[in-house]
Amino acid sequence: MCHSFSRARIHQETDLKGSIQNNNFVLVHGAWHGGWVWRPVVDELIGRGHRVIAPTMTGLGERHHLLASVTSLDVNIADIVNVIEAEELNDVVLVGHSYGGLVASGVADRIPHTLRTLVFLDSLLVQSGQCAFDILPASVVDERMASVRASGQSLAMPVNGLKGTGIPDDHPRAGWVHRRLTPHPLATYTTPLMLEHPLGNGLPCTYVHCANPSYDTLAPVREHIRSQHPGWGWESIDTGHDAMVLAPALLADLLERLAAAS
């Protein structure tokens, strides 16, 4: 039951402590973000003796210069698969945030033998053959496509400030997040997720709802998961969408607990 790289940052700790069960965490960021956004949680988990890798996917963050028409969901899935294989990781706790949930789904389909459990953190999820725009509300899709047209370029969805992150403008890390956001590759939202196995590929899966405030854009996803995947674990966390920024210690506690239970 389921209860950043290239300057892509690879964070690890070799001085592991005491009785703590040392876990391998791979943290996959969401749209407009990069591996950098996990820094507060990376620091928490490394401080507790775990190994943590938070890659930045192609076309985003410090890899935004690699944005191209071919920067698709499949490319981002390959980014994470290649990190796990290059680091020769096994027994991985794979965490996908927001758009990163689509990526984590593809990774689990391709290399399940390297994974212990999947954690979908306020994730965007679809069924095989669907793309991200297929499950989002039509008003959201229209708004995002209008922003692409207004930007005068066709490869990426422009940054829209902190909208959707749940981060208040007066939060101590608001400026840090805002200045590091980068346009998000449009093709990642129009590329269908093609799976050879059922979503989750038989691995223990947990969906974590960031409930305060709840990100209404993902309401259709949450409804689908609760109705179609009753065997998955379900957790709520008392913070907003960018939980790794808003409540890193609380999120680290939850990830440790889910890792220990799997």
Regions found by a protein language model. Give the residues of each.
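Conserved loop-alpha-helix segment in the C-terminal half of the alpha/beta-hydrolase fold
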Residues: A211-D238, D242-V245, R257-L258
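Active-site loop/oxyanion-hole signature of alpha/beta-hydrolase fold enzymes
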Residues: R51, M57-V93, D109-R110, F133-P137
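Active-site nucleophile elbow and catalytic-triad environment of alpha/beta-hydrolase enzymes
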Residues: R180-P198
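Conserved HGGG/HGGXW glycine-rich cap/lid loop of the alpha/beta-hydrolase fold
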Residues: N23-H64
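Short beta-strand/loop motif that positions the catalytic acidic residue
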Residues: Y207-H209
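Gly/Ala-rich beta-loop-alpha elbow adjacent to hydrolase catalytic centers
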Residues: G96, G100, A104
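Short beta-strand immediately N-terminal to the catalytic nucleophile in serine-hydrolase-like folds
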Residues: L94-G96, L121
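Flexible "cap/lid" loop of the alpha/beta hydrolase fold
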Residues: D109, L115, V119-P158, T188-Y189, ...
